[in-house]
């Protein structure tokens, strides 16, 4: 049968190689510490320098000042069910990378010049680069999820893929309701 989210969060199978990189006093009660851990983890993803026109927009997008609400909620939710919530960090990072991928494509669809008070990737590098960098971010999100052990990976990938499709469906419904500028 399918494993439920609480079961995924509290199982020892969720242990990843990243658990050892957290301080022993890591607390899910301290939102600033969680946010700092998320920022640190995102900074450690390590995109190559070349080709620069592919990876620079990804780094630019991920370093814009966002609230990191999605990964924060994922970490807090997993913390309810587990005494090792840091095991959820690869999934939290994948959700944030995926979210930023959707923003790159959304800016293209909206013809948006600005994102979070900065020039959008679309405005700064152009449509083709924004599409390709966004696509690389989507693939990178799946690569982050691949860090999980094979015992839980199929369930995690299935849930993530369902979420990704639902986000795309939501964007399409949004376009159907509110015509975009051409």
Annotated model-derived regions:
Residues 2-3, 13-14:
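Polybasic, lysine-rich low-complexity intrinsically disordered segments
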Residues 18-45:
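N-terminal amphipathic/basic leader segments beginning at the initiator methionine
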Residues 43, 47-182:
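Mg2+-dependent prenyl diphosphate-binding active-site environment of isoprenoid biosynthetic enzymes
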